[in-house]
């Protein structure tokens, strides 16, 4: 007879397959369209099997966020100065989250639970290398998160997507160049 733990698992079901299916659903339907029931149906398993791996939707979204965060790569000298490097990382974050409707807003609404020290460092390290204090760099990251979440919440009218994307990029640039200018006048 198998031990109870062995009976609890559906063959082939693991956290990564659950996260992958959740990402597919979010890409199609947004965060609001994701449910544990739909996820279980998509995976072809009983609802209880999914819950044995992931206890609730919020934990699932934390795992999804971690998967998305892992896609962000650090900038290097080929991306320009330190402010350009921070911008490069922020634009990656934006683009990754944009493919999954509702994730940026969910993350912004739950910042303490969804904060990523790794992502924060990808932006703050270049800013601190440029001479900003840790507090200033942290404030800039928070401002960029708010800008990103706000941009993701707005339903851009058809035909204005490129203009909205350009405005977002310009906003990131304005925030970072403003910080650069301020740091040079101390």
Language model features with spans:
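Key DNA-contact positions within bacterial/archaeal DNA-binding proteins
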Residues: 37, 46-49
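Hydrophobic alpha-helical connector segments
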Residues: 73-109, 115, 134, 141-144
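Hydrophobic alpha-helical bundle segments that form small-molecule/ligand-binding pockets
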Residues: 119-161, 179-183
């Amino acid at each position: 007879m198998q031990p109870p733990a062995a009976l609890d698992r559906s063959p082939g079901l693991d956290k990564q397959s659950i996260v992958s299916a959740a990402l597919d659903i979010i890409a199609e339907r947004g965060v609001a369209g994701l449910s544990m029931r739909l996820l279980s149906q998509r995976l072809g398993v009983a609802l209880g099997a999914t819950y044995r791996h992931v206890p609730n939707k919020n934990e699932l979204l934390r795992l999804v966020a971690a998967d998305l965060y892992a896609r962000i790569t650090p900038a290097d000298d080929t991306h320009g100065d330190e402010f350009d490097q921070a911008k490069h990382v922020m634009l990656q974050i934006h683009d990754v989250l944009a493919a999954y409707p509702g994730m940026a807003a969910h993350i912004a609404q739950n910042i303490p639970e969804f904060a990523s020290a790794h992502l924060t460092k990808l932006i703050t390290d270049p800013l601190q290398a440029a001479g900003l204090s840790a507090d200033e760099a942290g404030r800039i990251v928070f401002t960029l998160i708010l800008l990103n979440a706000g941009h993701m919440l707005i339903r851009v009218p058809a035909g204005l997507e490129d203009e909205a994307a350009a405005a977002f990029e310009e906003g990131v640039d304005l925030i970072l160049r403003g910080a650069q200018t301020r740091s040079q006048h101390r």
